[in-house]
């Protein structure tokens, strides 16, 4: 039997198991239902079976996730205690390939932040997205020339690329042409759908990038993201349960849509009605609000340590698509000034879904 046929067979078995679990009283494992972040945020291991994404980037889950190794050629995983270095095989293969390609342009190595929880889903703290194993945060801070201890990976501070004494301004003491080359390299991979950065960083790229601007439109401005950039992969081919995001519009994004971020509107506090009653607390997202398969995935048998190791090796062997830009430009040494305090961020954020 060929590899493709075997893969189809495994996928069919997973689909049958999911359907059978769902057939048992609807949500047998969660008959009383529960807040999804409490369920998925407390699962330590991925589910057994084939890898797949279910739902959308901000409302879904994943099965058969693969763990990014704690370190590899050109990268180290950070904040290990969060247990958020789990992704789809395509994401793990992308990170490993991108890390090697980044070193070719002179970047010392990648520090990898959150990817997803073992079975995806909403998190107890932090992200609205990162739910289906196809999102990853990559620090702007370059990797040191040593393997960090677990404690160092917890305590090493972020480096903001902004000048906190000014409004939405990149700090040229910390930002360098190599930072620009790094994020533009990331955008050049065909499987990368979007990259989220701070509006000031997007503006800096628009003003200073002299190379090929074909992939500039993939780089999207968003609140925060001054200490890391957020890479989002497209739904993999042949993934019917992964809900794709609307395509990025034409153009490089260096237009009125970027200028809006530098107006008062996105930063203004919402107007309060003094006569209005206090708003009710928002209803938590429940397991039943996610795609139906997610209840089965949350209650499915955990992958064994041996199976997880095999999946990790298979993901590492998976060929990642080549970047589509020239990576042979001269190297540039990154700046490494330490940052001031975090940038204040509005409480209201647009959806990343």
Language-model features and meaning:
Residues 2-15:
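Bacterial N-terminal signal peptides that target proteins for export
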Residues 106-108, 132-136, 191, 225-229:
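Envelope-exposed proteins and targeting segments
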Residues 19-28:
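C-terminal segment of classical bacterial N-terminal signal peptides
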Residues 48-113, 174-184, 189-192:
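Active-site acidic/histidine clusters and adjacent loop/turn architecture
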Residues 35-48, 94-125, 196-218:
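Extended, low-complexity, intrinsically disordered C-terminal regulatory tails
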Residues 33-36, 153-353:
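Catalytic cores and adjacent binding grooves of peptidoglycan-active enzymes
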Residues 117-172, 231:
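Acidic/His-rich structured neighborhood in mature extracellular/periplasmic domains
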Residues 32-59, 290-292:
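N-terminal low-complexity, Pro/Thr/Ser-rich intrinsically disordered segments
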């Amino acid at each position: 039997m060929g590899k493709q046929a075997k893969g189809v067979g495994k996928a069919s078995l997973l689909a049958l198991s999911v359907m059978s679990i769902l057939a048992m009283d609807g949500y047998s494992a969660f008959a009383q239902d529960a807040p999804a972040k409490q369920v998925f945020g407390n699962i330590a291991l991925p589910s057994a079976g084939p890898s797949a994404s279910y739902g959308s980037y901000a409302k879904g889950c994943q099965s058969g996730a693969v763990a990014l190794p704690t370190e590899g050629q050109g990268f180290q995983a950070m904040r290990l205690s969060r247990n958020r270095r789990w992704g789809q095989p395509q994401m793990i293969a992308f990170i490993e390939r991108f890390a090697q390609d980044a070193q070719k342009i002179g970047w010392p190595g990648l520090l990898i932040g959150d990817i997803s929880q073992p079975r995806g889903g909403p998190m107890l703290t932090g992200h609205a997205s990162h739910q289906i194993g196809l999102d990853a945060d990559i620090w702007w801070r370059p990797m040191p020339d040593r393997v960090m201890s677990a404690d160092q990976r917890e305590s090493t501070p972020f480096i903001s690329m902004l000048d906190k004494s000014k409004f939405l301004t990149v700090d040229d003491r910390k930002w360098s042409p190599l930072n620009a080359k790094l994020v533009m390299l990331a955008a050049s991979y065909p499987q990368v759908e979007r990259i989220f950065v701070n509006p000031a960083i997007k503006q800096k790229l628009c003003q200073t990038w002299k190379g090929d601007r074909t992939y500039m439109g993939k780089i999207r401005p968003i609140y925060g993201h001054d200490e890391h950039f957020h890479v989002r992969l497209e739904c993999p081919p042949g993934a019917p349960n992964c809900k794709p995001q609307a395509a990025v519009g034409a153009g490089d994004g260096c237009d009125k849509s970027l200028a809006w971020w530098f107006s008062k509107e996105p930063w203004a506090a919402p107007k309060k009605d003094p006569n209005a009653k206090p708003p009710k607390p928002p209803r938590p997202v429940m397991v039943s609000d996610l795609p139906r398969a997610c209840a089965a995935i949350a209650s499915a048998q955990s992958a064994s340590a041996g199976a997880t190791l095999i999946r990790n090796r298979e993901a590492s062997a998976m060929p990642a698509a080549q970047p589509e830009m020239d990576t042979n430009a001269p190297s540039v040494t990154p700046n490494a000034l330490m940052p001031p305090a975090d940038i204040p961020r509005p409480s209201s954020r647009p959806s990343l879904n």
